[in-house]
């Protein structure tokens, strides 16, 4: 699991790679990047939305400002497993994230069943405000994927992730039900994301140019909704 950070801001850019681009890039990253200590991990999320899917639709419209609320775990959780309640906002290309950690069962009861958590931090209050603002957020989708994370050997603020086997379901969204779902991308495709506190190093921009890897506007949740989720069933 990645180190826990309650508040941060950064630039995030996604890239959709085919198998040849992934293999070429992976082969030259080792001198610059090191693997996350956990190696490959499975990340599971519940995304929350209004009954008319307002947040998914706004995300797909590529607005200047957008936000999302999700509950994240590493692997299929049990009630006592650690989980992250995340409020993620993006404004003019900068990502601002607020997140708190609590047992999955407690987080689920809060976000899905409306039971107030023990947590009373400022971040918890911001999340509670968002729940109140939208009024009727429901568990809209479970979305899971397998991730390999790399960290820069020189710049602690630079991170690259590779997500494969992205799958989702609109029913039985409780993550305790497993990490299965319909595939969002082709098996040969990899979603890469570069996360940085500032500009990218020259060696990385040179690699992206050499392998013709270009930025892509891609939201996992919005893409799943737009591709398959025209009749999403909200499940608790």
For each feature predicted by the language model, list its residue ranges.
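Phosphate-end processing signature that detects enzymes handling 5′-triphosphorylated RNA
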Residues: 1-236
